[in-house]
Design a protein with these regions (language model features):
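Positively charged n-region of N-terminal signal peptides that target proteins for export
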Residues: 1-4
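Bacterial N-terminal signal peptides
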Residues: 7-15
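Domain-level detector for secreted/extracellular nuclease and nuclease-toxin modules, and
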Residues: 16-252
Length: 252
């Protein structure tokens, strides 16, 4: 059985919110948690699930060099609701015939180190309606870059999620799963004694663009999303790391 911990204040699940003091908030990959967050911790990632949109608000995880290798494969795996999340979720019927693909936030390919951990990426708590060309194209290229960075620096901290914005695409299915306007990804690594970060925003459409044009500082992304990324870092280190980015450092 897959390992899952669903955290709720005082052990109670309320309509649309849960919070825990038990999750290790010193984990660098986690944004600052809010009292209204419904936090679901899996073997390899953490999801802040939103029962209104039927998608995560964000997914965060640490990816090490060793974890980029392994024998687990995605063949035969399929998306399903997480039965232990006692909130409304999407299901497969919502996506069928919608014109939108089931887009992983924590990609299955980052979890080759464990078949069980890879299975856990196939929950709708880790999924958003995504343009198929984006999913197979620029977004996939960025996910591969993250694995390259994990191998180069030994470890990478990743936070990724949807941006609803004006909700210009509406919803899909009987569950009214909200289609994001765009997607974000924030990345942090330690190189020597310095921390370096970069962020990306990609619109939910096909791209024939350069990834450099989607890049921004984590500070800029925080302004767009309202999230405080990498909140466990001390304030001075975080501020220095997040205020800018160097494309040459990331080989973009």
């Amino acid at each position: 059985m897959r390992h899952l911990i669903i955290f709720a204040a005082l052990g109670l699940i309320c309509a649309g919110c849960a919070f825990t003091q038990d999750i290790d908030t010193s984990r660098i990959e986690l944004p600052a948690l809010e009292s209204t967050d419904y936090i679901v911790e899996y073997q390899g990632y953490v999801s802040s699930y939103n029962a209104l949109t039927k998608t995560p608000d964000w997914v965060a995880y640490e990816l090490t060099k060793d974890e980029t290798y392994g024998d687990a494969v995605r063949d035969g795996k399929y998306f399903s609701p997480d039965e232990r999340v006692l909130l409304p979720q999407a299901d497969d019927y919502d996506y069928r015939g919608s014109g939108w693909t089931r887009g992983h936030l924590a990609p299955a390919a980052d979890f080759r180190w464990s078949d069980e951990a890879m299975w856990e990426t196939f929950h709708f708590t880790n999924c958003c309606p995504q343009d198929e060309d984006l999913n197979n194209g620029m977004w996939n290229t960025l996910e591969k870059k993250c694995r390259t960075w994990a191998r180069k620096f030994g470890k990478v901290y990743i936070v990724t999620g949807p941006i609803v914005g004006e909700n210009r695409y509406g919803t899909i299915g009987d569950s009214h799963v909200v289609i994001p306007d765009a997607f974000f990804k924030a990345v942090m690594v330690q190189s020597g004694n310095r921390w370096q970060s970069i962020a990306f925003v990609m619109q939910n459409r096909s791209y024939n663009d350069n990834m450099q044009n989607c890049a921004m500082s984590v500070d800029e992304l925080e302004g767009m999303t309202g999230f405080d990324f990498f909140a466990a870092m001390d304030d001075e280190t975080e501020a220095l790391a997040e205020k800018g980015y160097r494309l040459s450092f990331w080989k973009l």
